[in-house]
Amino acid sequence: MRQLILALAICAVALFAQDAPHPPVGAGPKNLKVLKATEVRAAMGMATSGLGVTCTECHAADMSSDEKPMKLTARMMFQMTQEINAKFPDGKMHVTCYSCHRGTKEPLMAAPKA
């Protein structure tokens, strides 16, 4: 019995250690209008942490689809932050989603009361 459990554990470890299948060549982001393909992953991470949302907040099942209005709003917000950050001469990102949203879907319009 002990050997059977050990064998099953080894098989489970070997199974989970396998690489995930790689996406086919050309399977990168589609329908990009504001971001470059190399910026997408970082920008999505910034949005999810800055607004406290998940991918499905803006994206339909077909990630390239524009069917959800929130995706169009997100595009405008990404463009706005790019324009603001372009005004800083050091080239660094000074403004992010979190700057206004503070981890919530709707930005606070006033400081919280103490």
Regions found by a protein language model. Give the residues of each.
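Short, flexible, mixed-charge glycine/proline-rich loop motifs
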Residues: 39-51, 86-92
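Post-cleavage N-terminal segment of exported redox proteins
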Residues: 2-38, 50-56, 62-72, 80-83
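Divalent metal-coordination and catalytic microenvironments
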Residues: 32, 77, 100
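The canonical Cys-X-X-Cys-His
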Residues: 52-62, 94-104
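Primarily the internal scaffold of c-type cytochrome electron-transfer domains
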Residues: 27, 104-114
